Structures are given as C-alpha cells and as structure tokens.
C-alpha cells in the first residue's frame, strides 16, 4: 500500500454501534385489541347503523366525492363493526363508507369485527367521527360530546359522582382538544 500523502491523515475505522434493542410494545389497555384483528368483507345487508348514531349520513357533495372514490379505488379504510345479538353487525365507524359502497354498486365492504361494550363502542364511534369528518353540525358535535361524557362517566362510576363527572369533562376535553368550559357549553 502507498503511504499517506503529506497533510492527510487517515482516521481509524469507526466501530458500528450495535442496533438498539427492539422496543417492547405496550400492553393493550383494551383486551379486545389483544387478539389479532383481520379485515373481512361483509355483505352490506348484514351491516346495521349504530343505535343513537348522532351523525347524519347525508347525500351531499362530500358523499358524491366519496362514492366516486369508492368506485375508482374501493373502500380504503375498513369499517369498524361489532356483532349484534340478533345477527349481523352494528357499524361503529363507517356509516358513510357503507352508504358510499351501496351507491357505488358494491355488495360488500371491508370491515374489522371487534367485540366491544356499549361504552367502548360509543367512544370509538365518537372519536372516529369527530376526528375524520370534514363537516359536523353543532348539534351533532354536542350530542357526540355528551355521549362521550356519559360513557367515560359510566366507565369510572365509582365513588363520588360529582368528582367522576368533573374528571369525565376533563377527559372529553383532552380527547377533543377542548377546554372543560368549551365541552360544558356544548353538552349543557
């Protein structure tokens, strides 16, 4: 090998650090998510709206755009459903996708089936809609925030109910990026 030229120095080869240890995923708080969930295609006729669903499914310009998107590329995000006692499935999140699939001429759509309590279903449904929808009427927002409040209060219904109510308001505010006062204005 040639000796190094004057004025140039060679650094010792760098040692490569060992790759970091893989992170251990946190334990799911919701046991229903501990199982592997799969996307299944369910017949639209087996899907039923969530009871007391506070959000309107309107045949407006947004729906027409969604129908066109479904026609061109299918449903990109699976609906979240839970089994119904009387058969079929209750839609937790995906009412607009179901309507768009129907209007686009589809017979089925992708869904994730999850066993959920009523409170878990309410929180999943309201979270999805409050975060995803472009247009929400003030009345829809008020009703969905009230549903979240009641579900959170019900889940933590131990001890002092006034304290549980206060904590529920704070929790609803945190979930939606709102102050407690703003939440109160919507629901009372």
Residue spans for each PLM region:
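Short, charged/polar connector segments at secondary-structure boundaries
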Residues: 1-114, 121-132
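Amphipathic, charge-rich alpha-helical segments that serve as recognition/docking helices
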Residues: 55-57, 63, 98-188
